[in-house]
Structure formats: C-alpha cells, structure tokens
Amino acid sequence: MRRIFLLTVIYLFTFSAIQAQDESPYLLINKSDESLAEGITKIKSALSESGFKILGEYSPAQSEKLAVVCYTHPKLEEIALNFSDRGALASALKVGLKKEGETLKISMTNPMYMFYAYFVDGVDEQEMALRSISDQAIKAMKNIGTMEVPFGGTLEKKKLQKYHYKVMMPYFTDAEELKTFDSFDEGLKTIQQNLKAGKGETEKVYELVYTDKEVAVWGVALKNVEDGEAHFLPIIGDEHVAAMPYEIILQGNTASILPGKYRIALHWPELTMGTFMKIMSTPGDIKTTMEKLTE
C-alpha cells in the first residue's frame, strides 16, 4: 500500500511539473562563421538522417541574410490529422537561419510550444508521443550545435492552449475563413494553380496534401515589398525568422488561415503593443493576400 501511495505521489508531482512547465517559442542552436548555404545543407542532412522529411526552404523577405528550412515527421503528420480544428497546421516545423555580419545564427521553433498552442484540447493524450518527436528534432539539431538556448519569451502549457495576446484579441479557434468551395478537389486545384502563378506576389514554400482526409496545408512566402515579409519582419524582429512562412489550410471545402493578430503574437509573444501598432495593417494585408489564392 505504501508503495502504491508513493508511486501515486510521484505521478501527480510529475504530471503537475509537466503542466506548469514553461516553453519558449525558439531555441538558439548554434553560432558559426559558415555561409547560409552551408548551414542549410547541414540542417537538411541532420534532419533527414534522423527520420524527418524536408518539406522546403526559402529566403523570407527575399533577403540574402535570412533562410528557413521546413520539415515534418510521419508520426507528427499522423497525430496532427487527428485534431479536426486545423491540427495539420502543426505538421510543419521550422529551422531559421540569420547571417549577421560574419556570424550565422541557427535557431528552431520549439516543437512543444507549437504543439501546445495548435493542438489545444486533447493534447494530453498525445503528449508523450509529441514530446518524443520534439526530443528527436532537438537531438538531430545537436549535430549542428549544442547551445539549445531558449529565447523569445516563455508561456506555460495551459496559457499556450488558450493563448491570445490581449483582451478582445483572437484565439486559435477564431480562424478566418477565406472561401468555401464546391468541393475539396476544387479548392485544392484553385490554390495550387494560384500559387504556381504567384498570385498576390506569393510563392509556395511547401505543400502537404492528405487527399483521403481532405486536408491540405501550404507554407506561403509573402513577397510583396510594401506589405509582405519585407515590410513587417524588420519591425517585429527577424531573430524570429523561424516563424515563417505563413500558412493556409484547406479542410474539406473550406480554406482558412489563423488570424494575424493571433499567429504573429504567438510567434512574437514579447511584442509590445507599441510595436504591434506599427504593423497594424499587417493582419489584414496577410488575409487579403491569402484570399487571392482562393479566387
């Protein structure tokens, strides 16, 4: 009986610790004097050799000093598709690179931060599997560097699951619907064709299509100089470059995005209201751009 009691106490203590654990949106992995190209090659190799699938890469804001590598894992895709409220958005993880003078900084989105925010309800049942994927990704990046320094702020699991920037600001569940098509196939074809044509000054970074589930996700480069990445990243901070690219998701016959006021704040949780006001038009600009992909 004493043994059972002790095991119960240990379990409850461990569970409480997990519940209260702070997560940062990013981990700084390495600093070196390598080029962007060398860094990208090493990242792709390290992830591929650890069982991850490379989805795509690009230069945010069309900058020669910035790059992002997007990747996923088969188990993550499987789990994400079980979350009906846009869970597939969490399928793509990202590594960011920034060349600052002679120094190349490599950082990654913290997988658990994103999982807690995007999976919302029901994450507890998959937490061990998700933690395993997160640990595997971080371990893979140790082939690049061993710094593993959290940055970008901290939030507890419980707050991430119900995250919003301020009162009256949107939550994850307040996704913005862009268009309802007659069918999934029509929506898929329309968005694919528009991305191929670069409509709205966009470019496809990656694409995930699950035809049997009628779900598709795209990472989209926002290339308009006046209201795209080149406009807002320098203002809110390109140290968080791994936040990009922005996503559009097609579920069933409905295309939607996460509201800019939610997604930007989630990836820049330390952003002051003063700085946020400087990009006041950005959430609307992003929505307008993404809508063009559905027309």
Language-model segments: which ranges?
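Sec-dependent N-terminal signal peptides
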Residues: I4-S16
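Terminal, regulation- and interaction-focused segments at domain boundaries
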Residues: Q21-Q62, V120, K142-V215
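Mid-chain, structured segments of secreted extracytoplasmic proteins
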Residues: K65-M108
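Beta-strand/loop substructures that line and gate deep hydrophobic ligand-binding cavities in soluble
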Residues: V95-F115, L250-W268
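Hydrophobic alpha-helical segments and helix pairs
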Residues: I106-V149
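A cross-kingdom marker for long, charged
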Residues: Y206-E295
